[in-house]
Design a protein with these regions (language model features):
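The substrate-binding groove and active-site-proximal loops of carbohydrate-active enzymes
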Residues: 75-83
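Flexible, glycine-rich active-site loops centered on histidine and acidic residues
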Residues: 2-20, 83-152
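N-terminal beta1-alpha1-beta2 module of alpha/beta enzyme domains
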Residues: 1-72
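Hydrophobic residues within beta-strands of alpha/beta enzymes
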Residues: 42, 74, 104-106
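Short, intrinsically disordered, charge-balanced linker/junction segments flanking boundaries
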Residues: 153-157
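Structural motif
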Residues: 45, 77, 107-109
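Generic structural signal for well-ordered secondary structure
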Residues: 54-58, 82, 89
Length: 157
């Protein structure tokens, strides 16, 4: 009998009686348990301005979890690409892959990942308001792929 590959999706929940550091410790423990149990992948999400969720920065969480585990693949489920410069996403995940070869997965999404005010703050903080970021999602994906390819960069602007 063949069993399906098992994965975990972690939002890093912060309970009402819990500090964020305790929630991160619980996620590290869960990742270690999933790794030891033979799970295939551990996904972390990206959500902003939600006090009950500590998963605001997938690359940072992935680095924390990769340092606490030995085998399990770690990925973003996903990075909300309209909120980030494609170059930054490509660099972050290339660096993670270099540090933890064969264990890093980049999952991306085009949703804002938050309420409109928070989405505006994320994009405005990156150097300007970009109301067309979601519409340009396909070109952002192409740019990330190009920047992560061994042949170099061919940006679409």
């Amino acid at each position: 009998m063949t069993f399906p590959a098992l994965s975990v999706l972690d939002l890093v929940p912060v309970r009402s009686d819990q500090r964020t550091g305790d929630a991160l410790a619980a996620s590290r423990s869960l990742a270690r348990t999933a790794d030891a149990a033979g799970y295939t992948r551990y996904w972390v999400a990206e959500h902003h301005n939600m006090p009950a969720v500590a998963a605001t920065n997938p690359p940072v969480l992935i680095a924390i979890l990769a340092g606490a585990t030995a085998r399990i693949r770690l990925g973003s489920g996903g990075v909300m690409l309209p909120n980030h410069a494609p170059l930054v996403v490509a660099e972050q995940f290339a660096l993670l892959e270099a540090a933890f070869p064969g264990r890093i997965d980049l999952g991306i999404g085009r949703a804002p990942g938050s309420d409109p005010v928070t989405s505006w703050a994320l994009r405005h903080g990156a150097g300007g308001v970009d109301d067309d970021a979601v519409a340009r999602f396909p070109s952002y994906v192409d740019n990330v792929i190009a920047m992560m390819s061994p042949g170099g960069v061919g940006l679409q602007v």
